[in-house]
């Protein structure tokens, strides 16, 4: 089914929902959400967190701090750590682990330089990687996996394997919502949204892990650089890590976080890994479970 056929099948309210994404003040709403999430209003904050957790069915039994009163702000709640051993890391040395809790949005083979966003929608490696053709070349005919983090999910992101950070790229962009419905109806979504591209060397070849921003994702951070945004510079910014500034991370180690959920995209080189056969589109997943095996 092509895009025009899909549009013809949409209800009136679905069309309004899509149109609103194009006209709403994305940055203003995101800044407002960021301001709100920082506020410490005592009992009011605790009450609103409780309402949020009830609406989205957040499982607080897995959190290191299971009581709503333990969180002074929404930010603290959004990036709440898990209890010890809540997410065991698969220790098979030939296995790569899922970086986050959520659902598989898409996964599979990169067809030359095209990745599947949703049925009927493709986007290019070159666009996703902000025009870095040399970097994109590494992943032609490789494998990819896209994990969507909903508001209910654990919001920290971890490493699929041992790795050495080579480069980080901040790419300014739009702030469309990245929920599955919008992924089906906003072309080139992940390549047009704000994102942080992290490039690693691993025993499985080069690997990219991308944190994709979205509406009301107030900030993205990494453990080596802290909060990346805000501020939100209007140009692409690149950091390189080598020599004394090299950053080494271990399998399962936290590497970053979203202040409210979004999407993580992993890229792997050709003939280096085989994605786990049990993973399907819309599969619920947990950080630490198997994502792929070494070929």
UniProtKB/Swiss-Prot annotation:
Top-level EC class: lyase
Residues the record marks as active site: 101 (charge relay system), 158 (charge relay system), 262 (charge relay system), 262 (schiff-base intermediate with substrate)
An example molecular function term from Gene Ontology annotations: phosphatidylserine decarboxylase activity
GO biological process: phosphatidylethanolamine biosynthetic process
Reactions catalysed according to its record: a 1,2-diacyl-sn-glycero-3-phospho-L-serine + H(+) = a 1,2-diacyl-sn-glycero-3-phosphoethanolamine + CO2
InterPro entries, sorted: PS_Dcarbxylase, PSD-B, PSD_type1_pro
Cofactor (UniProt): pyruvate
Membrane topology type: Peripheral membrane protein
Cellular location(s): Cell membrane
Pfam families hit by this protein: PS_Dcarbxylase
Protein name as annotated: Phosphatidylserine decarboxylase proenzyme
Organism of this sequence: Pasteurella multocida (strain Pm70)
Gene: psd
């Amino acid at each position: 089914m092509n895009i025009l056929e899909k549009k013809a099948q949409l209800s009136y309210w679905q069309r309004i929902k899509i149109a609103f994404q194009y006209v709403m003040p994305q940055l203003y709403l995101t800044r407002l959400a960021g301001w709100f999430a920082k506020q410490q209003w005592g009992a009011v904050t605790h009450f609103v967190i409780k309402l949020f957790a009830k609406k989205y069915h957040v499982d607080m039994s897995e959190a290191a701090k299971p009581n709503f009163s333990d969180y002074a702000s929404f930010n603290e709640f959004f990036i709440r750590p898990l209890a010890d051993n809540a997410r065991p890391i698969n220790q098979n040395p030939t296995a790569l682990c899922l970086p986050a809790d959520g659902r598989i949005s898409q996964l599979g083979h990169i067809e030359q330089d095209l990745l599947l966003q949703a049925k009927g929608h493709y986007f290019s490696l070159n666009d996703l990687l902000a025009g870095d053709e040399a970097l994109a070349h590494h992943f032609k005919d490789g494998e990819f996996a896209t994990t969507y983090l909903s508001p209910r999910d654990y919001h920290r992101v971890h490493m699929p394997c041992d790795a050495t950070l080579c480069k980080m790229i901040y790419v300014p962009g739009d702030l469309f919502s990245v929920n599955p419905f919008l992924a089906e109806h906003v072309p080139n979504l992940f390549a047009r949204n704000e994102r942080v591209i992290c490039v690693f060397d691993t025993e499985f070849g080069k690997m990219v892990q991308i944190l994709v921003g979205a509406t009301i994702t107030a900030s993205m951070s990494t453990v080596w650089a802290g909060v990346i945004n805000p501020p939100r510079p209007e140009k692409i910014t690149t950091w390189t890590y080598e020599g004394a500034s090299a950053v080494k991370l271990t399998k399962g180690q936290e590497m970053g976080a979203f202040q409210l959920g979004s999407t993580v995209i992993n890229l792997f080189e050709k003939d280096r890994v085989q994605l786990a056969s049990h993973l399907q589109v819309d599969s619920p997943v947990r950080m630490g479970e198997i994502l792929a095996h070494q070929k």
